[in-house]
A protein has these predicted regions:
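Beta-alpha junction/loop-to-helix N-cap segments that form part of ligand/metal-binding clefts
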Residues: 24, 37-47, 56-129, 138, ...
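Segments of small-molecule ligand-sensing domains
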Residues: 296-307, 318-393, 398
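N-terminal signal peptide c-region/cleavage motif recognized by signal peptidases
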Residues: 16-18
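Venus flytrap/periplasmic-binding-protein-like
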Residues: 72, 116-118, 123-127, 200, ...
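Extracellular/periplasmic Venus flytrap/periplasmic-binding protein
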Residues: 78, 124-125, 133-239, 276-283
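Periplasmic-binding protein-like
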Residues: 86-99, 115-119, 163-168, 194, ...
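Extracellular/periplasmic periplasmic-binding protein-like sensory domains
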Residues: 235-314, 410, 421
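Short beta-strand segments enriched in small/hydrophobic residues
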Residues: 22-42, 97, 163-169
């Protein structure tokens, strides 16, 4: 009843009030540089979803949305400049799409009262909303991904005494899962080898020669951009079994496997959202966006992994904005109100189905203490002949007995260093 009344109040305000400014969702994109192949489809999916809401629904709560893009080139300094140049436009939330940029923006955005959603990337301990009041990383983070990979391997057989290699991008991003995997190695008795790959990742011969020599039972990869396709090709060159090779969700797009052709068949990647275009929402994207000539890109990325991820990020932002409108009884929300909407966000299967995205992601609730969601992780596998990803393992829990103490420890250290008081009542 409360929700109904709030929705009616929003509608009443809209009917009686003046024309309001757009709801602004800046896109810190990278359509250029070594990571453009990943940045472009995400930015397209993010923009196209909001365009669909404008064309089909008249925006959110009767207010049109606007997605100003600022090109970062995946460069941290440029990312900060983009934030500074767009925050005054009424920005409601930032999706930096870069762990390096996210780390730099956390203190700035928190001071400015603007929320950050670093979905499946960024600073993992930001899941602790008591410390990171303005940062959210639901529905899953890097440490959930590391645990999800190990849980999947354990579901296939005992991993005690097995050798597992981590091939990782030698950056803040790539180093994120190391501590979690070290703790999981202690807990489950597997041997962990770490193989860093320097930016941008085009040279990996030494790492894969070491893998050929040491013959690990499994390889887990935290890569991005050209690093991924080079790794898949190098694995094929040494005839490493693709079914034993698992990428994090940033190493599991079509870009990463297509260059290797049939040799990539069987490669696996973690995910926290649906794959493919067999969802009703895509008919509306086609009708209101692509066919109408409003697509952010060429319209040929629909249903690809990273387009879907951008669309999913936009959907979660839009649903948080609706929640904020209901909480505050106004359609013309501020960044502070948006933060409240993100913290009260509930994603149910019924809601996803109503949005044309049935089963697209896990059900989850956000709270003051938990900005990270449930950490449910699925597994996908590449079929090279069909050129499709399939979900082979449903969204399943990660080991929070290991992960939560690490989140608590890291966030407590951050709070002490930065003199941050508890934000949850």
């Amino acid at each position: 009843m409360k929700t109904k009344l709030a929705t009616m109040a929003v509608a009443a305000v809209m009917a009686a009030g003046p024309v309001m400014a757009d709801l602004v969702f800046p896109s810190l994109s990278y359509r250029t540089g070594p990571y453009a192949a990943g940045g472009i489809p995400f930015a397209d999916g993010y923009a196209d979803y909001f365009t669909m809401l404008n064309e089909r629904d008249g925006g959110i709560g009767g207010i049109m949305t606007k997605v100003p893009e600022c090109e970062t080139g995946y460069n941290t300094e440029k990312g900060v400049e983009c934030y500074e140049s767009t925050k005054g436009q009424g920005a409601l939330v930032y999706q930096p799409l870069s762990t390096g940029i996210t780390y730099q923006l956390i203190p700035k955005a928190t001071a400015d009262g603007i929320p950050i959603h670093s979905m499946g990337y960024g600073r993992t301990s930001a899941a602790n909303g008591d410390v990171f009041s303005n940062v959210f990383n639901y529905p899953a983070n890097y440490w959930n991904g590391a645990s999800g990979a190990i849980n999947y391997l354990m579901s296939q057989g005992d991993i005690a005494g097995k050798k597992i290699a981590l091939v990782y991008h030698n950056s803040a991003y790539g180093k994120e899962p190391i501590r979690t995997l070290e703790e999981l190695a202690k807990k489950h008795g597997f041997e962990l080898t770490m193989l860093p790959v320097d930016h941008p990742g085009q040279e990996q011969k030494s790492q894969w020669l070491q893998i050929r020599r040491e013959k690990p039972d499994n390889v887990i990869m935290y890569g991005w951009g050209v690093m991924n396709q080079v790794a898949v090709q190098e694995a094929a060159n040494i005839r490493y079994p693709m079914e034993d090779f698992i990428g994090i969700w940033w190493s599991g797009s079509e870009n990463d496997v297509l260059p290797a052709g049939d040799a990539a068949d069987g490669y696996k990647a973690l995910t926290f959202h649906g794959v493919g275009n067999d969802f009703p929402v895509f008919a509306d994207i086609q009708k209101y966006v692509v066919d109408a000539g409003n697509a952010a890109g060429a319209g040929d990325q629909i249903g690809t992994v990273l387009y879907n991820r951008g669309l999913y990020a936009a959907m979660l932002a839009a649903e948080a904005a609706k929640t904020a409108q209901e909480i505050h009884g106004t359609a013309d929300i501020t960044a502070a109100m948006m933060r409240d909407g993100m913290e009260a966000l509930e994603i149910t299967e019924a809601k996803m189905a109503a949005l044309g995205l049935p089963g697209f992601g896990p059900e989850f609730n956000v709270s003051c203490a938990n900005h990270g969601g449930p950490g449910l992780v699925g597994m996908t596998q590449w079929d090279a002949s069909a050129k499709t990803w399939s979900l082979i393992n449903e969204f399943a829990p990660s080991d929070m007995d290991v992960i939560q103490p690490l989140i608590d420890e890291d966030s407590a250290a951050y709070a002490a260093e930065n003199n941050i008081a508890s934000s949850c009542k």
